[in-house]
């Protein structure tokens, strides 16, 4: 990455406090147009707090933030119109049908009825869900719900999509297939900002930042980080950065462990 790259997210000195607790402590970074940017760290590191601020859902305590060309303080609605968002729970309503979910989110994103109908047809054909059009979301396998949720999140063709722990709760094979969808979106020019605590997934990103206790401890390409810390994989990079000795790792509470593909 270099200065000629167009920035789509600029964050300077972001702070988010809850009382005296700093969930985000002076974060500064840039995300470039068209890249897959990994926002990594253990559970509780501050990733979800930051992503909700970048999406315009929460107000920061302080700092300068520009997303998709818009100021997060004064142009929140413009930010929301130019981004997509998918959470770990897949952002779908389980008590309505596949088509009703597509229609609902298309309306939220401001698409016309004609656009919704056309894109719904294209989406269901691409995902091979044409025969599931009128099925409740709750009846679909978890992997299919995940695919549909991501497709709905980019239904309006946003400049940028935020994926907050999108592969949580699914098996390793399904996670790998989901990343194929992410690559396809990136190939269409959509910037992908993904948070995860699966360090294996860092290998799929163009660049990654690693959060520790509300701060960005390091940021670079996966290969550069592995070279810098002289290790073979991103899990070992995380352990080095977090200053956790390997023999102490198994003593951590489960929520702080970095999960690995089996």
Q: How would you label these PLM feature ranges?
A:
Residues 103, 107, 114-132:
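Conserved ABC ATPase "signature" region
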Residues 95, 136-143:
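Conserved ABC ATPase signature
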Residues 219-220:
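ABC ATPase "signature
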Residues 161-165:
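Catalytic Walker B motif of ABC-type/P-loop ATPase nucleotide-binding domains
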Residues 63-71, 78-79:
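Conserved ABC transporter NBD signature motif
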């Amino acid at each position: 990455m270099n200065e000629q790259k167009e920035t789509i997210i600029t964050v300077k000195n972001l702070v988010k406090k809850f009382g005296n607790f700093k969930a985000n402590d002076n974060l500064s970074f840039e995300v470039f147009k068209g890249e897959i940017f990994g926002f990594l760290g253990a559970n509780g590191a501050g990733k979800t707090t930051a992503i909700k601020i970048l999406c315009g859902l929460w107000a920061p305590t302080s700092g300068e933030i520009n997303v998709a060309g818009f100021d997060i303080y004064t142009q929140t609605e413009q930010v929301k119109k130019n981004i997509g968002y998918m959470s770990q729970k897949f952002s779908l309503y389980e008590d309505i049908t596949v088509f009703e979910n597509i229609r609902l989110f298309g309306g939220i994103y401001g698409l016309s009825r004609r656009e919704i109908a056309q894109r719904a047809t294209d989406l269901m054909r691409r995902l091979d869900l044409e025969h599931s059009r009128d099925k409740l979301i709750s009846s679909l396998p978890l992997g299919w719900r995940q695919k549909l949720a991501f497709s709905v999140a980019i239904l309006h063709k946003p400049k940028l999509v935020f994926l907050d722990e999108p592969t949580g709760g699914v098996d390793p094979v399904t996670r790998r297939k989901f990343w194929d969808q992410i690559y396809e979106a990136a190939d269409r020019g959509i910037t992908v900002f993904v948070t995860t605590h699966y360090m294996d997934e860092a290998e799929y990103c163009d660049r990654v930042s690693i959060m520790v206790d509300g701060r960005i401890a390091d940021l670079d390409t996966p290969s550069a980080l592995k070279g810098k810390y002289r290790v073979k994989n991103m899990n070992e990079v995380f352990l080095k950065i977090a200053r956790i000795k390997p023999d102490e790792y198994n003593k951590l509470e489960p929520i702080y462990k970095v999960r690995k593909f089996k």
